[in-house]
A protein has these predicted regions:
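Non-heme di-metal
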Residues: 1-100
């Protein structure tokens, strides 16, 4: 279970950090003085969002290893519950980064 906790928390941190940073970048980008700074913050947000997908794939891979065809595992149940939430959150941040 530790693997799943680590990946879950890592994905959560990546999304929180990416969203926070792209929101800051969007607030700063209109200031001529802060354009370069906001661009770096936006790059960081993009990198965190990309890292989310690395952990996402690792999480799916670990779940695939745990499959029991006769019974849903705790990990699968957990993933079903959080997967949609994470995907919606990811898509929202991705739109903000692309809009930036």
């Amino acid at each position: 279970m530790t693997k799943f906790k680590v990946l879950f928390k890592g994905m959560m941190d990546d999304l929180k950090e990416a969203e926070m940073m792209i929101d800051y970048a969007c607030k700063l980008k209109d200031s001529e003085e802060d354009k370069d700074f906001s661009a770096e913050i936006a790059k960081y947000a993009k990198a965190r969002l990309e890292h989310f997908m690395v952990f996402h794939k690792m999480f799916e891979s670990e779940i695939a290893k745990e499959k029991d065809l006769g019974k849903e595992t705790v990990q699968e149940c957990m993933w079903k519950e959080i997967h949609e939430m994470y995907q919606d959150w990811y898509n929202n941040i991705d739109r903000k980064i692309k809009k930036y």
